[in-house]
């Protein structure tokens, strides 16, 4: 084989390989990629739930909450929060934000799957109360619904 022919063949092969690689990398993402595990699916569900919470989407938020959930607040209080109360909070709280830093599956305990959400919550009320907290919030899920939340303050 002539050396010029060999170089031309290598160039054709390299170009065709690059085209194949390029077309493989530019294929549209599949919308219905199966979840890798139930744990991953729960984390994705939690991501969607927190997004709905921040957007004050009461319908989506309420769907994932049982009639009332026990909240162990970072300030030491233990309160029952009803779905209606949570929706009222979302509607009536003038200013709040929740900067999510991470959402991770923690494990399974007492028949519940637990997901931790780490982030910064800021709320201000018309009466002057202001909350600015870095929290780790553990959400216990059972049967596709949030049944309990435990909050811990953390340093950034």
Question: Which residues does each PLM region occupy?
Answer:
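Short, low-complexity N-terminal intrinsically disordered segments enriched in polar/charged residues
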Residues: 25-68
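Short, cysteine-centered beta-strand-loop-beta hairpins and adjacent loop/turn segments enriched
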Residues: 95, 123-131
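N-terminal secretory signal peptides that target proteins for export/translocation
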Residues: 1-8
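Short beta-strand edge/turn micro-motifs at domain boundaries
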Residues: 28, 132-156
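Bacterial N-terminal signal peptides
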Residues: 11-22
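Hydrophobic/aromatic beta-strand elements that line small-molecule binding cavities or substrate pockets
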Residues: 86, 100-107, 120-122, 134-140, ...
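A solvent-exposed, acidic/Ser-Thr-rich amphipathic alpha-helical stretch
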Residues: 39, 58-110
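A short hydrophobic beta-strand element
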Residues: 111-121
